[in-house]
Amino acid sequence: MSYYAFEGLIPVVHPDAFVHPSAVLIGDVIVGAGVYIGPLASLRGDYGRLILEAGSNLQDGCIMHGYCDTDTIVHENGHIGHGAILHGCVVGRDALVGMNSVIMDGAVIGEESIVAAMSFVKAGFQGEARQLLVGSPARVLRQVTDQELYWKRLNTKEYQDLAIRCRTGLSETKPLTQVEENRPRLKGTTDVKPKSAQ
């Protein structure tokens, strides 16, 4: 694991969280219970405080950072998709930030909201609960439906379960040189499907 103290501040990681060995946590970072942090995530707590609350996830290649005297927060069960950037913002409880989205300083994503993939949320945006945000710059398209929120929660549950699975089932290894006969497929825990398959 890549943990670095910075000017006396040491990252805090709950023992029930999973942090991939290639992720980097620097300084003022606080990671709650059941959190999943994916490969190559960068959490630079060298200016502002970075907080991932219980049950949230920060997937592969995500970046968290913020200015001095600010908190960048992903609240409980927040879901941050691959490659997203969070800078000095707040992501509400049970909200989802889609892949490769950018959330800027002082922005607040309301609880149970969804930010569509590739969206850009401008600095200072103040969201409300259950908003679907789309575009660059992001605009409120409509309210999140019950079906969309259910789908989001299933995906978040998958990552909460993945944190548990990775703590016991992930190990560094050498690759095989050929595909074995009857190679098994991995399964999730919730049977969640991509939105395109619904």
From Swiss-Prot:
InterPro entries in the cross-refs: CaiE, Hexapep, Transf_Hexapept/Carb_Anhydrase, Trimer_LpxA-like_sf
Compositionally biased tracts (Basic and acidic residues): 180-198
Gene Ontology terms: biological process: carnitine metabolic process
GO MF, one annotated term: transferase activity
Region annotation (Disordered) ranges: 179-198
Superkingdom of this protein's organism: Bacteria
Pfam family, one: Hexapep
This protein's UniProt keywords: Repeat, Transferase
Pathway: Amine and polyamine metabolism; carnitine metabolism
Protein family per UniProt: Belongs to the transferase hexapeptide repeat family.
NCBIfam families to which the protein is assigned, alphabetical: PRK13627.1
Function: Overproduction of CaiE stimulates the activity of CaiB and CaiD.
PANTHER family tied to this protein: DYNACTIN SUBUNIT P25, GAMMA CARBONIC ANHYDRASE-LIKE 1, MITOCHONDRIAL-RELATED
Record-given protein name: Carnitine operon protein CaiE
Gene: caiE
